[in-house]
Amino acid sequence: MGELFRPIGADQLFDWVFTELETRDSILGIPRELFFVPRRDAPYRSTIFNHSLETPIGPAAGPHTQLAQNIVASWLCGARYIELKTVQTLDEIDVSKPCIDLEDEGYNVEWSQELKVHESAEEYERAWVLIHALHRKLGFPGASPGVVFNLSVGYNLEGIRQPNMQWYLDEMADASARVGELVDIAAQHYPEVADLQVPGRLSDNVCLSTMHGCPPDEIESISAYLMQERGLHTLVKCNPTLLGPEGVRSILNEDLGYTDAVVPDEAFGHDLKYADAIPMLNNLRGIADECGLEFGVKLSNTLEVENFRPVFDEKEKMMYLSGRPLHAITVNLADKLQTEFDGELLMSFSAGADCFNTPHLIAVGARTVTVCSDLLKTGGYLRFLQYIEELENLQPDARIDLAAYAKETRSDPRSVSYTHLTLPTKCR
């Protein structure tokens, strides 16, 4: 496994994309017949942060959203809410490899970007220009591609105020100069792109990712800064430990049967507590109202568990759970929070989402649904096409009771550990 990312040049990437389209009728190995073609009358079209979304789904901040070609591939397959990989001031981190284990449920020891801050910005700018160019070249309807780039930043206010992060936030707010240069490169292969008005602002919204153990006043200070000083619609990524030790363990170990996955006491000890989260979220909703912005939560982060599998380096004492078992935990957390806020808390959902449960998540009130673990399985980005097929059956204004769905997830065979499943009597 390679130890370092080495992004290719913009001219090489653009040549690859447009030449492959002309010579093979495919892009990045995806044949044209599998491109998602948006429809104006699609039942799943929606909005977030005052932007139109052709679909409410996309890749979660993670391995799928670090390089331009990955972002473009996900867009071609129907992703329209794209969470960009988390960027932080420390951009020379040593990531243990392998860092992802997805034999079934997911475990990882990876965290923020593996590129320099300026390299991350460049990747996102390339993807932005390519998406706008391909939207026109492929003849898709609408003047704009109906896509939202959701920034992800971390991990504390001191880091976000560092010069490289200040430059990054400035660049995402106005990348006109670099966007213009990239449009010129694209025009060498597709001259009509020069006639497009590709926006210089890549994003006006952000998800705050904080370290485990970040105190509520720090989370509140960072979020307030992002709204008051940066004018960004803001989501706070919450940890599943917010459900509390009894809530998490009863679902994970008892209901779902993942008895090997041990959530240590310290995970609950250093993470944000529910009693502290509620006043914090109320305060931040008030700040958002004062700023004329939207504020909400992303549910959820991964779950800290003891490293019991022989995959990661022995020095990794903890690893982070994702995928199937996290779904039930996070849905039950969503139910608890929405009960607290009378269903008015803006929520983006990312925890064990798949093609079958995504319509349910939209119907219980999730504004967007993002995916990571499921995309790391066979099919990759093409799995998004089945998500959209399932969303086609979504009735306008369809609503499902969140409390009932939360209860259902605790015994859903698709979430239960395979070693915990028992055959019906007639099959024995």
Could you describe each region identified by the protein language model?
Residues 1-223, 229:
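N-terminal capping/small domains of soluble enzymes
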Residues 27-40, 244-343, 378-393:
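Glycine/Thr-rich beta-alpha phosphate-binding loop at enzyme active sites
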Residues 56-58, 81, 146-154, 233-237, ...:
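Structural preference for beta-strand elements that scaffold enzyme active sites
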Residues 62-64, 87, 239-243, 300-304, ...:
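Active-site beta-loop-alpha junctions enriched in small/polar residues
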Residues 83-89, 364-386:
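Glycine-rich phosphate-binding active-site loops on the catalytic face of alpha/beta enzymes
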Residues 94-106, 377-399:
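C-terminal helical cap(s) of enzyme catalytic domains, especially alpha/beta-barrels
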Residues 353-366:
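Catalytic cores of alpha/beta
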Residues 419-425:
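Conserved small/polar residues in nucleotide/adenosyl-binding loops
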